[in-house]
């Protein structure tokens, strides 16, 4: 699972601030969160099961690129998070911020959302940051998240999680391309599209690995 941020929400322009999004990232204690929900902590998107070379039984996480993409303490860095939060708030001219996180009404997602509701204000300061929660059925939540294309203010924060093909890990990144029709978040990047297309359709895509 990862936190989904609606960066084009006109009512909360700070969501488009890179430093603020980094503050949220570095402000998540993934080890304690995973322990609470009986899951494995991860600060990365590509899971440990995705293969890069079947002949050698090498997963992406086994490669030098996969290892180089890891962060100490699963990315949790409270001091860095607080610094980035303060800088973002100053840049946006804000003294206090209230955000709402939408989540599906299951026990697991409630636990995860409540964890952030408690930990982020404790880290950033309860007098400066508040996280409200809004539970709803999964189908309704999907509609809300995908509604950003016609209603930019459809949501602020939510959760996302995609299933990929272990034998073609690169294909899972289609969810973040500009042309994927069921995008949950307004991430659009021309360079990302080019890399995705090269990995999936270029003539030399099988020169290394699988």
Model-derived features: positions:
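Bilobed "Venus flytrap"/periplasmic-binding protein-like clamshell domains
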Residues: 103-118
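Immediate post-signal peptide segment of exported/extracytoplasmic ligand-binding proteins
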Residues: 18, 78-100
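Short helices/loops that flank or line small-molecule/ion binding pockets
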Residues: 114-125, 139-155
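Ligand-binding clamshell of periplasmic/extracellular solute-binding protein-like
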Residues: 1, 138, 155-172
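Alpha-helical secondary-structure segments
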Residues: 1-48, 70, 95-107, 204-210
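Structural transition elements
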Residues: 41-87, 106-110, 205-209
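A local structural motif
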Residues: 94-100, 121-137
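Extracytoplasmic/peripheral linker and loop segments enriched in polar/acidic and small residues
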Residues: 34-37, 69-75, 129-142, 169-210
